[in-house]
């Protein structure tokens, strides 16, 4: 089952992306480097819950 997740910026800007992931094949927390338009740099985004 694919669950929706929120990718929060580690730069502390409050910017986020939403995506989904398969929890059976990826049980660990998701981390990826993406572009943060607020600071205009590539930063790490970490998985968080959608409220």
From Swiss-Prot:
Provide the alphabetized UniProt keywords: Ribonucleoprotein, Ribosomal protein
Q: Does the keyword ATP-binding apply?
A: no
Give the record's GO CC terms. Answer: cytosolic large ribosomal subunit
Residue span of region Disordered: 1-20
A Gene Ontology BP annotation from the UniProt entry: translation
Family indicated by similarity: Belongs to the bacterial ribosomal protein bL33 family.
User: What's the name of the protein?
Assistant: Large ribosomal subunit protein bL33
Organism from which the protein derives: Psychromonas ingrahamii (strain DSM 17664 / CCUG 51855 / 37)
High-level lineage: Bacteria, Pseudomonadati, Pseudomonadota, Gammaproteobacteria, Alteromonadales
């Amino acid at each position: 089952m694919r669950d929706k997740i929120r990718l929060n910026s580690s730069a502390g800007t409050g910017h986020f992306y939403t995506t989904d992931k398969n929890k059976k094949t990826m049980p660990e927390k998701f981390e990826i480097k993406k572009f943060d338009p607020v600071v205009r740099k590539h930063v790490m985004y970490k998985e968080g819950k959608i409220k």
